[in-house]
Amino acid sequence: MDWSKVYSYCERGGDPSFWAEPLNAISNGAFTIAGLIGAWQLIRSPRKDHALFEWLLVVLVIAIGIGSFMFHTYATVWAIPFDTIPISLFMLAYLGYALRRFAGAPWIIVIAALVGFYLTVRYAQGIQCSNELLPMTRGAGKRCFNGTLGYTPAFAALVLVGGVLLVQGHRAAGYLFAAAFLFLAAMTFRTIDLEVCTWTIRAGRGVGTHFLWHTLNGLLLYVLLLGAIRHGAPRDALPKAR
């Protein structure tokens, strides 16, 4: 187990203690709240199917909150998978869900899209900064866009799948577009966390903007859950028109 500390966010600075990132840690409650409200609405849903996949999405949202809380408190290398794995699983699961349940794509298309998405994310995560890019992307020991580039394929997927659903006239399209808007705002706050650190000093410590990344993501995941709960029933489980 690697106990090396990770100092990647403004709020932590160089403090190795458990509660060095109080806002970053507590704001993960947004994911737990989103998951619990989603579970409550799923229980109350009039759907006739068993909604097993929707329950998986709910569990993954709650797991994201728990894993991210662990990472922003322990802030060690061993805690990184607890933060990243639930996020990765949710992105893959929801993309497959949206393509299959919402868009009605055949399995071969769904599988190909998931493989392509995974490879695109891996590529985006490996993009190296150069000093010729925007100021916030300069090398100087910083991750490119503060590590946010790895999430851009997810934003693109929301927009593209939302566009397909819009053309199909599917009511879930609006949920994906709303989530894309929230995600764009969230990625912005994640990107500028270190850039604005000196402007957000309170009580002698930097606050940053990473907690807004959590808060907005909690809201967008709730929007995605709501779209799945309301409009994700299999076509043969939909009420018959009379």
Where are these regions (language model features)?
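Multi-pass alpha-helical transmembrane bundles in non-GPCR membrane proteins
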Residues: 1-242
